[in-house]
Amino acid sequence: MTLRPGTMRLACMFSSILLFGAAGLLLFISLQDPTELAPQQVPGIKFNIRPRQPHHDLPPGGSQDGDLKEPTERVTRDLSSGAPRGRNLPAPDQPQPPLQRGTRLRLRQRRRRLLIKKMPAAATIPANSSDAPFIRPGPGTLDGRWVSLHRSQQERKRVMQEACAKYRASSSRRAVTPRHVSRIFVEDRHRVLYCEVPKAGCSNWKRVLMVLAGLASSTADIQHNTVHYGSALKRLDTFDRQGILHRLSTYTKMLFVREPFERLVSAFRDKFEHPNSYYHPVFGKAILARYRANASREALRTGSGVRFPEFVQYLLDVHRPVGMDIHWDHVSRLCSPCLIDYDFVGKFESMEDDANFFLSLIRAPRNLTFPRFKDRHSQEARTTARIAHQYFAQLSALQRQRTYDFYYMDYLMFNYSKPFADLY
């Protein structure tokens, strides 16, 4: 059958349209950015710590600035053959592989979106942070202060890891036991693990965790006894082996530390310079009986009136008449930072900035900020470096040196300067 000329022209035109369409589709696919076709992380950027969204698939989590009578040590049992590796803070400056110019531009844009979305980012903060109210930036903010806080975290983790590598080389091969995690509190909704260091803001941190867990609407509503004697927050050692290891490997682990001499003086002032129904009879009586010559009958009966040099004698005595207490124990013993890879290390001296940066990192509600009020003895001045020096001036140079030696690992791991020029 012979086709008419008009029919042939129509067939040719239709074939041309199909060919042009196929060629255009191939060209479009070849130019499309592969990062837009598959949702994946940008090469070279490892977002290991991610702001946490609330989770409801796990159950929600006493004590210490309250005077709970519990031993520091607990019976241990093996949990694993090695310490679970923690997650690192995001590292936005890792090098990218060589790419075409158009692809590089799209990757850079996508990278910025990821940084803004996932990493309100952290370098050394001055010991005296600004008195101006801290306004927590939203997820879309990435200003210079935020970057500085991110770099601070990187530096603190580096110093801590170097100290562990130098002095605790065997720690990474030890198994995690319930004793190692007995001071860690769990907040399941935002997947947070907080290691409690007494006299370093722990009361207010537990208030924050209770608000995060939905147990209170405001930190101001939570009384001291509720914080320390309630059972609202769970400790990590109350979970079974699988629950402990799961949380250690997937939750954001953080601790806050304080200059060791200031923390020690703060504990002494709180426990021995104010009426206390536990520390005076348990610790005070033993200290006075051992270290005060000709102690009065009344002092031996009540345990009140312990002086700072007597307290330091007890602290440094290898044959103490009464055991250690978490309020003046080493952070390296309380939180095992050479065994547990903490994601965030905050400092009491820069508490407001560090705490609110951490809250932004885990995507806490915008109206939740770290409380500024003093938990106990609110009319009394906080223990500062100046006040700590006044107390340590009561000691001999040898006692100061021995106390520094006692806390040497805490000074080293958390990069605190020597508080006295004659220390070595």
Curated annotation (Swiss-Prot):
pH dependence, entry free text: Optimum pH is 7.2.
Tissue specificity as recorded in UniProt: Predominantly expressed in pituitary gland. In brain, it is expressed in pituitary gland, cerebellum, medulla oblongata, pons, thalamus and spinal cord. Expressed in the epidermis. Expressed at lower level in lung, spleen, adrenal gland, placenta, prostate, testis, mammary gland and trachea.
Lumenal-side positions: 32-424
EC number: 2.8.2.-
Keywords attached to this entry: Carbohydrate metabolism, Glycoprotein, Golgi apparatus, Membrane, Signal-anchor, Transferase, Transmembrane, Transmembrane helix
Enzyme class (EC, first level): transferase
Record-annotated membrane-spanning stretches: 11-31
Pfam families: Sulfotransfer_2
Membrane topology value: Single-pass type II membrane protein
GO terms of molecular function: dermatan 4-sulfotransferase activity; sulfotransferase activity
Region (Disordered): 47-107
Cytoplasmic-facing ranges: 1-10
Binding-site list for 3'-phosphoadenylyl sulfate: 198-204, 258-266
Keyword Transferase attributed: yes
Glycosylation sites: 128, 294, 367, 415
Induction line: Down-regulated (17-fold) in prion-infected cells.
Origin: domain of life: Eukaryota
Basic and acidic residues: compositionally biased ranges: 66-77
Family: Belongs to the sulfotransferase 2 family.
Protein known as: Carbohydrate sulfotransferase 8
Native species: Homo sapiens
